[in-house]
């Protein structure tokens, strides 16, 4: 059997330590580009696009293996710095646990949930934040997605849902926070997230994170509906060297926030050294 094709990677910067940025979703490539460009002034930055659905089944293990191939050359110089956003933060922890010698430090931005208590808190917070119109639109899109069979239309519906969720998860976004639009991958989201939840249900995660040797820093907005303190508590049971840093007046995606973006970049740069 032929090995799967390598994944797409974008490069930024010409000097400094290697930093790898993992996007969220799963299935939302390109959203880390503003952060990559900013860090490119001081670091050599890799922005991999996680594998899309279709060629091989998508699992956490598949994404870890793909990332290992991306890092083959940078690792010749030594361990790298790994930064993940949302789902990408969850993948960063999985990689650091399964290949601990590859990673010098880990930064988690708006990390996702690893237990039922945290997920229930997230769902409750999202419900509180949604306006009646947003709730109706989300319910309508979810109903259409449930019966749609065309891949392209499913991806379009998924992208609309993602935009609505991002709006609810933000606090005071900058007026000029438009991001480049890349195709979303609804099937990739579904396959990967099902496997991630299975790992939690079987007790594999977060227990396997006890193998992480690198220091871990969580950067979390105080207005992020993902419950940062609860997520930190679930991880700290297994990761002794984990630090929680909260940004005031900040939603899920710090770099788009009017009151938090500058503090976020300052903190992220300090964490990466």
Language-model features and meaning:
Residues 79-122:
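Conserved hydrolase catalytic core segment
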Residues 250-262:
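Catalytic histidine-centered segment of alpha/beta-hydrolase-like enzymes
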Residues 5-57:
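Conserved HGGG/HGGXW glycine-rich cap/lid loop of the alpha/beta-hydrolase fold
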Residues 46-87, 264:
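Active-site loop/oxyanion-hole signature of alpha/beta-hydrolase fold enzymes
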Residues 212, 218-220:
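Short beta-strand/loop motif that positions the catalytic acidic residue
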Residues 107-146:
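Flexible "cap/lid" loop of the alpha/beta hydrolase fold
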Residues 140-207, 214:
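Alpha/beta-hydrolase
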Residues 225-231:
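Conserved alpha/beta-hydrolase "acid-adjacent" motif
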């Amino acid at each position: 059997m032929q090995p799967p094709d390598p994944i797409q990677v974008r490069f930024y910067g010409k000097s400094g330590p290697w930093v790898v940025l993992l996007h969220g979703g799963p299935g939302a490539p390109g959203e880390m580009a503003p952060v990559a460009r900013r860090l490119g002034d001081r670091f050599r930055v890799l922005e991999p696009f996680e594998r899309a659905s279709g060629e091989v089944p998508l699992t956490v293990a598949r994404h870890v293996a793909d990332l290992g191939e991306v890092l083959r050359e940078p690792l010749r110089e030594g361990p790298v710095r790994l930064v993940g956003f949302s789902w990408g933060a969850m993948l960063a922890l999985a990689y650091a646990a399964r290949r601990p010698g590859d990673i010098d430090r880990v930064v988690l931005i708006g990390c996702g949930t690893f237990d039922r208590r945290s997920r229930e808190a997230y769902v409750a917070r999202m419900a509180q934040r949604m306006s009646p119109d947003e709730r109706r639109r989300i319910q309508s899109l979810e109903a259409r997605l449930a019966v749609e069979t065309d891949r392209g239309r499913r991806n379009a519906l998924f992208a609309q849902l993602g935009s609505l969720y991002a709006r609810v998860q933000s606090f005071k976004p900058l007026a000029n926070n438009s991001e480049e639009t890349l195709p979303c991958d609804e099937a990739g989201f579904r396959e990967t997230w099902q496997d991630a939840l299975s790992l939690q249900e079987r007790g594999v995660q977060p227990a396997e994170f006890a193998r992480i040797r690198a220091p871990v820093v969580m950067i979390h907005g105080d207005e992020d509906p993902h419950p940062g303190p609860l997520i930190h508590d679930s991880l700290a049971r297994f990761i002794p060297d984990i630090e929680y840093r909260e940004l005031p007046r900040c939603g899920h995606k710090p770099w788009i926030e009017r009151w938090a973006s500058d503090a976020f970049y300052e903190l992220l740069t300090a964490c990466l050294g």
